[in-house]
Amino acid sequence: VQIQVTGRHVKVTDDVRDYIHSKAHKLPRFYDRIHDIEVVLDHESEQFTAEMIVRVDRKHTFVARETGPDTFALIDLVVEKLGRQLTKHKEKNRNHKHDDKSDYVSEG
């Protein structure tokens, strides 16, 4: 999985970058067709904003955004949100691909 980390109005330290990579590498557990992950950290008026964009199957994009004072906590929250979104997407795909044929009973 390709992970790109960008900072707007803030320098992304190696500790933060390593933390993002360790958390982002857990996302394929929720959905294994992740193409790439983009993380944008922004600092504005005493608040940080963490935005994570996950592209899957080359046609679906999932975005999670959080704002707060602690960068590490924001990353945790964003990864948690994306985990829920990816799980929901996976379940949705699973349910659409397999129609339940048990409702159709052949009478003979």
Task: List the predicted regions and their residue ranges.
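N-terminal, polar/charged subdomain of small-to-medium soluble alpha/beta proteins
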Residues: 1-108
